C-alpha cells in the first residue's frame, strides 16, 4: 500500500514537471546568442589562462 502511493506520487510529479527539450536547453546559460556566448567563454577561459601569469608577475614585482 505504501509502495503504491509512493509510485503514484512520483509518477504524478514527473508528469507535472516538464522542461524544455532540445540542444542547449539543459545548460545553465543561453546558447541562442552566439556573440554573448563568445564573450562569456572568452572571459571565462581567458581569466583562467591569464591568472598564473598575473600571479607570477605580481610575485616578481613584489621582490
Swiss-Prot record:
Q: Which residues lie on this side of the membrane: Mitochondrial matrix?
A: 17-33
For side Mitochondrial intermembrane, which residue ranges? 61-63
Q: Where in or outside the cell is it found? A: Mitochondrion inner membrane
- The transmembrane residues are 34-60
Q: What InterPro entries does the record tag this protein with?
A: COX7C/Cox8, COX7C/Cox8_sf
Q: How does it sit in the membrane?
A: Single-pass membrane protein
Indicate where this protein is primarily found. mitochondrion
Single Gene Ontology BP annotation: generation of precursor metabolites and energy
Instruction: Tell me a GO cellular component.
Output: mitochondrial membrane
N6-succinyllysine is carried by which residues? 25
Name the UniProt key words of this record, in alphabetical order: Acetylation, Membrane, Mitochondrion, Mitochondrion inner membrane, Transit peptide, Transmembrane, Transmembrane helix
Q: Where are the N6-acetyllysine modifications? A: 25
- The organelle targeting sequence, given as a residue range: 1-16
Entries under Pfam families matching the protein = COX7C
Pathway given for this chain reads:
Energy metabolism; oxidative phosphorylation
The similarity comment for this entry is:
Belongs to the cytochrome c oxidase VIIc family.
Assembly description: Component of the cytochrome c oxidase (complex IV, CIV), a multisubunit enzyme composed of 14 subunits. The complex is composed of a catalytic core of 3 subunits MT-CO1, MT-CO2 and MT-CO3, encoded in the mitochondrial DNA, and 11 supernumerary subunits COX4I1 (or COX4I2), COX5A, COX5B, COX6A1 (or COX6A2), COX6B1 (or COX6B2), COX6C, COX7A2 (or COX7A1), COX7B, COX7C, COX8A and NDUFA4, which are encoded in the nuclear genome.
| Biological role stated in the UniProt entry | Component of the cytochrome c oxidase, the last enzyme in the mitochondrial electron transport chain which drives oxidative phosphorylation. The respiratory chain contains 3 multisubunit complexes succinate dehydrogenase (complex II, CII), ubiquinol-cytochrome c oxidoreductase (cytochrome b-c1 complex, complex III, CIII) and cytochrome c oxidase (complex IV, CIV), that cooperate to transfer electrons derived from NADH and succinate to molecular oxygen, creating an electrochemical gradient over the inner membrane that drives transmembrane transport and the ATP synthase.
| Name of the protein | Cytochrome c oxidase subunit 7C, mitochondrial
